[in-house]
Amino acid sequence: MSRYRGPRLRITRRLGDLPGLTRKAAKRSYPPGQHGQARRKRSEYAIRLEEKQKLRFNYGVSERQLVRYVKKARAQEGSTGTNLLKLLENRLDNVCFRLGFGPTVPGARQLVNHGHVTVNGRVTDIASYQCKPGDVIAIRERKCSKQLAEGNLEFPGLANVPPHLELDKPKLNAKVVGRCEREWVALEINELLVVEYYSRKV
């Protein structure tokens, strides 16, 4: 399953607020479609699937990528669900979004893919790069790169930069100063349901 490129508000109407996907709010609170307002009891599978979809759409990863992250999270010590969230939060595109360099995760990914971002002084165009403590993320010393980032920083997607990131706004750079904690994740999600969803599939 490839990355979603369709109408984003249809997704937020079905799944709820996804800060990484879009900053717009849906006008209608019920799911799209002919039977969107119908009340029906959801199965346990449907609830788990919905939580999984929240994660996939918010961080803009494909199904195949998410499966890889689940496997990696299982191999690490500690809670699989928390490990999974940390892996997704540490992606370079998401870190750029949390810093305000991009208005959304897809917007931040475009900055990375087009070579506007450096990590430790080197241009890095791999959105899935795992940021770690000590890494310095900066906007490239080019007029077009700076203009894009400065424009986005005026209206960031999220109000607050998480404590594990230290932003120097005038210099358009930031440092990863610690590990991302569970409570700093902006998405409302039950990650245990995501782990349960994949328990029989992976």
Curated annotation (Swiss-Prot):
This is Small ribosomal subunit protein uS4. The keyword RNA-binding applies. It comes from the Bacteria. Part of the 30S ribosomal subunit. Contacts protein S5. The interaction surface between S4 and S5 is involved in control of translational fidelity. Gene3D superfamilies: Ribosomal Protein S4 Delta 41, Chain A, domain 1, RNA-binding S4 domain. NCBIfam families: PRK05327.1 (NF003717), rpsD_bact (TIGR01017). It comes from Synechococcus sp. (strain WH7803). One of the primary rRNA binding proteins, it binds directly to 16S rRNA where it nucleates assembly of the body of the 30S subunit. GO terms for cellular component: small ribosomal subunit. Belongs to the universal ribosomal protein uS4 family. The gene is rpsD.
